[in-house]
Amino acid sequence: MALNPTLTSWRGQRVWLIGASSGIGLACAQALHQAGASVCVSARKAAALDGFVAQHPGARALALDVTDADSVAQAASAAWGEQGLDWVVYCAGHYQAHEATAFDLPDMLRHQDVNYTGALRVLDVLLPRLLAQGHGHVSLVSSVAGYRGLPKSLAYGPTKAALTHLAEALYFDLHPAGLGVSVVNPGFVQTPLTAQNDFHMPALMQPADAAQCMLLGWQRGDFEIHFPKRFTRWM
């Protein structure tokens, strides 16, 4: 049974993706644009965003820093515009392999600020507008690293566990108000973040394949979207 409204076509859907300059976020933006959605992309790297817009007619770019509340508020207002938004997808992420034997508090807090608190800043601005609008969908891109403690995931894993927990709580509060909520828990995907890993990454996926899994899950009305199944079911 679908926990969110299903979707038959992306054509005309207004989607704002935060963290879309590379990796999964960029691949999702590309797939959504190809499917006919009206796409707005945001990240810190303005040049990468401008490159996306140049290659995808009709797309918009809004540079922001998710660790800066004013930056988020300005970009959110611009993304909302006069027509509102149908989808808000939080893909922003920071990752460095960490072990407790080399504890690094500043970078631990950087993980928290980007991966979790950044999502809160976006929600703080947009939830009142989405509730007033009476429809819309919030999707948080988490990770299977949030399922349980894993090696070298001392900083990253807990922030993703928090993001998944946040999505679950949001669903209970927002579903009765007519809003959709989903959480995406990818396994290993070939991105600039995972490129630093010096260990074997089982069932490694390409970003374009991950994006297709996400679009299909959103269309089906899934709450949790996890992939690849041969890996995530084991987790």
Regions found by a protein language model. Name each.
Residues 183, 199-234:
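C-terminal helical subdomain
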Residues 56-70:
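Rossmann-fold cofactor-recognition segment
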Residues 99-112:
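Substrate-binding pocket helix/loop in short-chain dehydrogenase/reductase
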Residues 37-51:
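Conserved glycine-rich Rossmann-like NAD(P)H-binding loop of the short-chain dehydrogenase/reductase
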Residues 143:
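Residue(s) in the substrate-gating loop at a strand-loop-helix junction
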Residues 21-22:
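Conserved glycine-rich cofactor-binding loop
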Residues 123, 159:
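Active-site helix of classical SDR
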